[in-house]
Amino acid sequence: MNPIVKSFEYGQHTVTLETGVIARQADAAVLASMGDTTVLVTVVGKKEADAGRDFFPLTVNYQEKTYAAGKIPGGFFKREGRPSEDETLIARLIDRPIRPLFPNGFKNEVQVIITVVSVDPQIEPDIISMIGTSAALAISGIPFSGPLGAARVGYIDGEYVLNPSVAQLATSQLNLVVAGTAGAVLMVESEAQALPEEVMLGSVVYGHDQQQVVIKAIAEFKAEAGKPTWDWTAPTQDADLVAQIKELAEAGLGDAYKIQVKQDRYAQVSVVKAATKEALLASNPSIDLREVDNLLGSLEKKVVRGRIIRGEPRIDGREPDMIRALSVLAGVLPRTHGSALFTRGETQALVTCTLGTERDAQKIDSIMGERTNRFMLHYNFPPYSVGETGMVGSPKRREIGHGKLAWRGINAVMPSAAEFPYSVRVVSEITESNGSSSMASVCGTSLALMDAGVPIKTSVAGIAMGLVKEGDDFVVLSDILGDEDHLGDMDFKVAGTRDGITALQMDIKIEGITKEIMDIALQQAYGARVHILNVMDQAIGSHRDDISDHAPRITVIKINPEKIRDVIGKGGAVIRALTEETGTTIELEDDGTVKIASSNGEATKEAIRRIEEITSEVEVGRIYNGKVIRIVDFGAFVNILPGKDGLVHISQISDERVANVSDHLELNQEVAVKVMEVDRQGRVRLSIKEAQTKETAAAE
């Protein structure tokens, strides 16, 4: 075994790429490390494509092993199970920039598996996973237009920071990941604290500039360790068939794409395609219909793009910077804590907000450590939203990714736990879809949060931008339709407030997207965002003054931290009795903060009263109503507060001489007692006769 190793400095860390020792039966295997965070990336591709396949079957599997962090998995089986949300998101992060770098017409199955085998808790494994994937594909021999670079960019104290540590990210106003080739940005994923457009654009340019060192190093690594490139050539098109299809279908497709209603348009496109196939089959019964479908798809793309470049109206008749008609409704569901229905053209989201206590927060235990999410956002895309049938069940990768993008868009305006001590779950049900459903979810979430009384800092809106570029000519499109997303060159989603951007996601399919084009897209998106915010604010301009009557109300009180154990009780008996008997939820924190949650105000008051009783100090000279709990020869023990007992000596029972305690007191008898003394050991001395004397004097 002769390892080939390439090391280089990248930001604050040393990156090492190694091949030739591990997983040698794969087409390529790279052990990539950044500091102590190490991933094993393997690539395997089939030498032949399966017959009849009309798509590129690329699979990216990202898996985090708990041994990488020196942990043993929880659960009964004590081994890793289905991918977590974080693993799914990182798999998508790797997939998105590499997919457009495979050549058109390449249909061979390719599988990339990234395994995290060692992790430094200060170095996220996503960037080194992207770098390792780029290196493995570069040396595999599989047709791939790499290398690809990747960088994380932070923004701290007005300065960009390359690949910030986890600790630095905690103070950063920006968490942006950018990936690209030597000449082009291909993918951006980010979360920001309402930063200006120029700062966001600058971070993309900065990250792309910095990752050139990665691209150069991988090119050198490939020169030393790369396998011969596969002998693969793209399938050639039948020029005569292309001409026939153009003659038969171009005019019909052009007319079909003037129909503004999506379902009607699709129906007419199907009619045109069916007529074209029928005509071709009549002249050549053995024609390959799969090839015809592919060529019709290419013609369809050319027709739509040509209209846009020529300055003609878009598919639905709009100008490039126009937003579809908006409908905004808040408070549409009677029993939810907050709700909204946001409609933009043929895209619609029904969004609900549910408030809960801290114990409802999501607890996440990953290889990067434990964390708690008080704000959750779940996105559902049922098949009926696009007029189709399909499976309904656990969320797919796309749904998880779209939900996280919407979460990033909103998270910057969420209140702190001190400002709003609730856990918040938002669910976005996409009820109609024709482009930009994730950004509709951002708008709907902002509205539903306000309807629920969540004190978010300001409204947030999202917009999806598109691009059509032919040579030096280009058109930036606002509020793209699903067809424009599919047929265009860029999907550019921006969420933010009036003051700045909170989330930016870009997926670019071509090279040649300049800084100028991205700047135009950002400025056009700003205008669209403000327009949407104006409409949203007419429906609900600020959060409700109070939360829903159906939501649990959390009351916060403070107790002496030393009294926490008294509230909990032995084996949790006291707090269990409190919650069961009052019907409330009670949470205790180490600093003495007590949170009582209930939708019943009287139950909350009763819980507070009982907690105050338990935690109150015995006051010397005060009269308490107590209960006799034990009788002894020399007196009786009386409970005056939960967990607080005192002794009434036989001489303090009555002014008269008492020979037998049982003649004057009995178990469970309620008596008034006065606290005479609390000694150094906390023992309480009580008196019944002094209490009676004080009560008699007060009556007189």
UniProtKB/Swiss-Prot annotation:
Entry-linked Pfam families? KH_1, PNPase, RNase_PH, RNase_PH_C, S1
Q: Which PROSITE patterns match?
A: KH_TYPE_1, S1
Gene3D superfamilies in UniProt: GHMP Kinase, N-terminal domain, K Homology domain, type 1, Nucleic acid-binding proteins
| S1 motif domain location | 621-689
Task: Please verify whether the record's keywords include Nucleotidyltransferase.
Answer: yes
Q: List ligand-binding residues for Mg(2+).
A: D485, D491
In which domain of life is the source organism classified?
Bacteria
Which controlled-vocabulary keywords does the entry list? Answer: Cytoplasm, Magnesium, Metal-binding, Nucleotidyltransferase, RNA-binding, Transferase
- KH domain residues: 552-611
Where it sits in the cell: the answer is: Cytoplasm
Keyword Repressor set for record? no
Q: Write down the EC number.
A: 2.7.7.8
What is a GO molecular function of this protein?
A: polyribonucleotide nucleotidyltransferase activity
Which reactions are catalysed by this chain?
Answer: RNA(n+1) + phosphate = RNA(n) + a ribonucleoside 5'-diphosphate
GO-annotated biological processes: mRNA catabolic process; RNA processing
Recorded GO cellular component terms are:
cytosol
**Which co-factor is required?**
Mg(2+)
Query: Which family, according to the similarity comment?
Result: Belongs to the polyribonucleotide nucleotidyltransferase family.
Record text on subunit structure and interactions: Component of the RNA degradosome, which is a multiprotein complex involved in RNA processing and mRNA degradation.
NCBIfam families per UniProt: polynuc_phos (TIGR03591), PRK11824.1 (NF008805)
Physiological role: Involved in mRNA degradation. Catalyzes the phosphorolysis of single-stranded polyribonucleotides processively in the 3'- to 5'-direction.
Q: What protein is this chain from?
A: Polyribonucleotide nucleotidyltransferase
Organism of derivation: Shewanella baltica (strain OS155 / ATCC BAA-1091)
